Regions:
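Catalytic domains of carbohydrate-active enzymes, especially glycoside hydrolases
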Residues: 1-19, 52, 149-165
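Substrate-binding surface in catalytic domains of secreted glycosidases
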Residues: 19-111
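Extracellular/periplasmic catalytic domains that process cell-envelope and extracellular macromolecules
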Residues: 46-47, 75, 131-133, 155-156
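Short, surface-exposed beta-strand/loop "edge" segments at domain boundaries and coil↔beta transitions
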Residues: 48, 136-138, 172
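Glycan-binding loop/region signatures in secreted carbohydrate-active enzymes
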Residues: 79-149
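Short, loop-centered acidic/histidine patches that primarily coordinate divalent metals
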Residues: 144, 165-167
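Aromatic-rich peripheral "rim/lid" segments of glycoside hydrolase catalytic domains that contact
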Residues: 167-178
């Protein structure tokens, strides 16, 4: 099973970054008894009371400080792990679903060339707009500075853990680790 495989490989943590309530509920007790940490998607926090809770910092609406503060109240800052997903999304305006199209490095570079880029304190991300086919588009993006700001905000709120993924953050690791 999972516990035996974690022991064999000397893993200290199991991360379930997607909503999977049945899975996290089934893993919670065996992992806890074995001294192996469990990190779960915030929608599954109720299924694993001793687990750390992954809270995504990539927002397309709302206010990051309000969101993280609400999560601290709901779960406790000591349980939270910032899921520092690197945002690179292209949205139509208006965008009632809040769902954008992920951009590759090459697509983002082509779109942002020659454009003025702004910082949104509320979203904790950079953005710019452009027009295509008579439609206004909105691009949200994270870089080393924006992720560093999100980490600093988390620290101010008492959140001392974060998760970065590779390869999406490989080019900005130096910006984040100093």
């Amino acid at each position: 099973g999972v516990v035996q495989e974690c022991r064999r490989r000397r893993y200290g943590t199991v991360i379930v970054p997607f909503p999977a309530a049945e899975l996290t509920e089934a893993l919670a007790q065996p992992l806890h008894r074995s001294g192996i940490a469990l990190w779960v998607h915030e929608k599954c926090a109720h299924t694993a009371p001793g687990a750390r809770v992954l809270v995504c910092t990539a927002l397309s609406g709302g206010d990051i400080e309000n969101r993280l503060s609400a999560c601290c109240r709901a779960f406790g800052a000591d349980r939270i792990v910032l899921d520092l997903q690197r945002l690179r999304m292209d949205f139509p305006l208006p965008c009632p679903t809040g769902e954008g199209i992920p951009l590759t490095d090459e697509q983002l570079a082509a779109l942002q060339t020659g454009r003025q880029i702004f910082f949104s304190r509320e979203l904790g991300a950079r953005y710019f707009t452009y027009r295509r086919g008579g439609e206004t588009r909105f691009v949200l993006l994270d870089d080393g500075d924006t992720l560093h700001r999100k980490i600093a905000l988390g620290e101010r709120l008492g959140i001392h853990r974060g998760l970065l993924t590779l390869p999406e953050c490989a080019d900005i690791l130096r910006d984040l680790t100093g």
